[in-house]
Amino acid sequence: MVVEVDSMPAASSVKKPFGLRSKMGKWCCRCFPCYRESGKSNVGTSGDHDDSAMKTLRSKMGKWCHHCFPCCRGSGKSNVGASGDHDDSAMKTLRNKMGKWCCHCFPCCRGSGKSKVGAWGDYDDSAFMEPRYHVRGEDLDKLHRAAWWGKVPRKDLIVMLRDTDVNKKDKQKRTALHLASANGNSEVVKLLLDRRCQLNVLDNKKRTALIKAVQCQEDECALMLLEHGTDPNIPDEYGNTTLHYAIYNEDKLMAKALLLYGADIESKNKHGLTPLLLGVHEQKQQVVKFLIKKKANLNALDRYGRTALILAVCCGSASIVSLLLEQNIDVSSQDLSGQTAREYAVSSHHHVICQLLSDYKEKQMLKISSENSNPEQELKLTSEEESQRFKGSENSQPEKMSQELEINKDGDREVEEEMKKHESNNVGLLENLTNGVTAGNGDNGLIPQRKSRTPENQQFPDNESEEYHRICELLSDYKEKQMPKYSSENSNPEQDLKLTSEEESQRLKGSENGQPEKRSQEPEINKDGDRELENFMAIEEMKKHGSTHVGFPENLTNGATAGNGDDGLIPPRKSRTPESQQFPDTENEEYHSDEQNDTQKQFCEEQNTGILHDEILIHEEKQIEVVEKMNSELSLSCKKEKDVLHENSTLREEIAMLRLELDTMKHQSQLREKKYLEDIESVKKKNDNLLKALQLNELTMDDDTAVLVIDNGSGMCKAGFAGDDAPRAVFPSIVGRPRQQGMMGGMHQKESYVGKEAQSKRGILTLKYPMEHGIITNWDDMEKIWHHTFYNELRVAPEEHPILLTEAPLNPKANREKMTQIMFETFNTPAMYVAIQAVPSLYTSGRTTGIVMDSGDGVTHTVPIYEGNALPHATLRLDLAGRELPDYLMKILTERGYRFTTMAEREIVRDIKEKLCYVALDFEQEMATAASSSSLEKSYELPDGQVITIGNERFRCPEALFQPCFLGMESCGIHETTFNSIMKSDVDIRKDLYTNTVLSGGTTMYPGMAHRMQKEIAALAPSMMKIRIIAPPKRKYSVWVGGSILASLSTFQQMWISKQEYDESGPSIVHRKCF
């Protein structure tokens, strides 16, 4: 694949941003780095632009941004807001005129659009600006307005959802779910999800309701949408998914939830940014660390080919760079412009980041070198090399000595050949001899090659070459200085030669006495000396026959003497002959000739001996130097060996530390693996629970398996299907048995009768209520009532339907367990739930907070409820309800002369109570009115045709609810019990309870009950407290209606007790799942 890369354009080719450049005169290369070739900077010594057009522009722009205009920062405080853009309207106007900004010339304004500088561009944050909707009320219909504001009563919202399309869109293509999710109205979101609204609808910016909930940080709404299956990977028009917005908001919990529900951690937006790259670009260190732990791809590239490390360097975040380097990230990767992270750090002058990258690179090199080498093997090889080198130096010493002897022999042969060639010219002989020796010195520090039988490629030791070279240089220098003296006539060579011979003989004697052993040790050197003696004698013979070059022997002798000072040659000698001594020239010529010959011989012998002595000393010094050198090398080798041993021990310690770290890392990885396994197990359990909930949901949502709702009252039993507005079956909770066997012969007599059938035959049956004061006392009869409900009233099979039962508050735990056992073991229901009667009653009124005064046939309860949860510590129970009132009415009717004694007659009195009785607002005043007139009297016709008159008994009967002393009870009335429950509740919710007092149950159906409760509670409550009594018209069935609503909610499906859970945990499961 070939990738085209836009290189950075030259300054001359950059398009002038409209007419701004001509107005500004010449560009400032500091403020506008991309245009620095356009001319000389127009910045004066004061650091400001001199051009009048620039000053005019500056005055219009307000205050300069010192990042975008570094030369103009003296104008005032930067005008860059938190969004990274200029707030000044003039700046925005200028920005619109210039089109898209150059991120190099205007670094703070890079959010305006794509940069024209190619691969060096940057990204804008417009996708993340202003997350909430801009809503105008006139643009929304009734449903959308209710979803946005969320202040509509629940019952009105339910009615609204029934009448309208929940997926309807407004002008901005927003559904009610979009608006409710963006504004955090979780209750509206619940209702919309219960109505099966569409989840993945897109608004005008292609955003789902889940994206808006995450973008606006409404976590509760977002979690509900995820639980109902909203796709978290749908991108908006910017390519951002929900995970991008969670990372931008630094919401780690939401990001974790999104990943659990399948969000793609490697999804890219239109800029090529994954959530990790976005977190790095926005310098969100905590979420970057979180994504790294979640195994996000550290080598992902944006559209410019930049990795997370390069983005972190460009942003100047040293902490994120350090965090990424801990993950062994590749620091050498290049973006599309060919630049690495280090190059960006250097160009941006991020010195701390440069140091971090350098340290990381050094650590990597050390790590690679340590992996490729074995310190123990290197130590062994070093020791072996040292030992072999020492052996080689010891073996090479004898070879050097033997080479020295051969060199001396070759040098003598070379002198003889030179003498034969230059016999006609004495001066040329010495010159050629000296120059020949000097020219033979090589550049490599070895003994020079001579014209002899020795091979040309033969090399000699360094120390011999240095000594020989030094002697030759001294001879050459002395020859050049003394040549004028040789040609002078006043020289007397015989006298100097004689003095020199005497001194040499004396020194030779002393040297022979002091060094006898050395001469015996160097036989080869003596032979070489004899050859040199012959050479000198030949030179003297040539001197005798020459008249012009008489000074040659003197020069040779003096040259040898002068060389002693520095190189250990023949030392200077003192002649015993006076300097002024002279010899006759003509008379004693023969005598002088013989004497000269003797003196010459003696001189040659002494010179030979001196030369041998000097060479012996030179060899001894060389041997001493070799020994010292060997000793120093041995000491160095010992020191090196110690250093190597120390390094070896250090490496072993480091290896031990590395092994310890490796073991620690293995242990930590095992712990993490164990934790991951535990997390997997917990996730599996959650998945199992979700599968159970889904199964129950499918079970309850099927029309053939609708939920059965049964309200078990002390006097009446109400039963029906969830979702209905009223119960389908209402019958008395009584069981009748024949008083005598055989009384109903021939009529298919049964052992027991239930409900209305038992009530119709009450004359010959013994009637019993299986519930007393809200508590089941006869389980056999209660089981008969449930059997009659399923098979006779509703005509359904209980094993095919989930069942919701109600119970009175503060019911004993044993009764709840027995109820659960009968439902699962006797009727084999697939699922069940037990609800407290007061909670469904409050749901019927459209509230989740309030106090319910529930008075039925057997018991009265006052239950404070907050946010759908009953408060047990403030719940009160009063054993005074509708069943005691017929007995009291029978008693006060006896005062008028009407006697009702049998069970059948008691049912007649119950009917009188329900049809004629009412609650007086002022009992004393009503009694006075009844005594003074007959206006309150009513007539009632008995079954036998007799008509009776009822007077003050009409309001005296229900008055017992407010004054239990009429019945001989010492308890409080229903109004005082309600007030006491409110006072037992928390102070913070008492106001809500006073204004939301709900009446429920058949006993509260008396006319005037609500007004009397209002009056009595207002007298007890604080004077400034507002009291509101809510008396629904169908409150006789409000418990059942609330249970029908509760069982229809989708959120309720997870609360069922399944048959599998009952088999695993037994009847006690009801206490954990039913509160």
UniProtKB/Swiss-Prot annotation:
What GO terms describe the biological role, i.e. biological process, of this protein?
axonogenesis; cell motility; substantia nigra development
List each coiled-coil range: 399-435, 642-698
Which residue stretches does the UniProt record annotate as biased composition, category Basic and acidic residues?
377-392, 401-424, 466-483, 495-530
**Disulphides:** none
Q: Map out region (Actin-like) in residue numbers.
A: 702-1075
SUPFAM superfamilies, alphabetically? Actin-like ATPase domain, Ankyrin repeat
The segments carrying the ANK repeats are 172-201, 205-234, 238-267, 271-300, 304-333
Where does the source fall among the domains of life? Answer: Eukaryota
Q: Where is this region: Disordered?
A: 369-530, 544-599
Q: Name one GO cellular component term.
A: cytoplasm
What's an example of a GO molecular-function annotation for this chain? protein kinase binding
Work out whether the entry's keyword set contains Glycosyltransferase: no
Q: Which of UniProt's keywords are assigned here? A: ANK repeat, Coiled coil, Repeat
Locations of Polar residues compositional bias? 485-494
Family, according to the entry, reads as follows: In the N-terminal section; belongs to the POTE family. In the C-terminal section; belongs to the actin family.
* PANTHER family (alphabetical): ACTIN
Q: What is this protein called?
A: POTE ankyrin domain family member E
From what organism does this protein derive? Answer: Homo sapiens (Human)
Upper lineage is: Eukaryota, Metazoa, Chordata, Craniata, Vertebrata
Q: Which gene encodes it?
A: POTEE
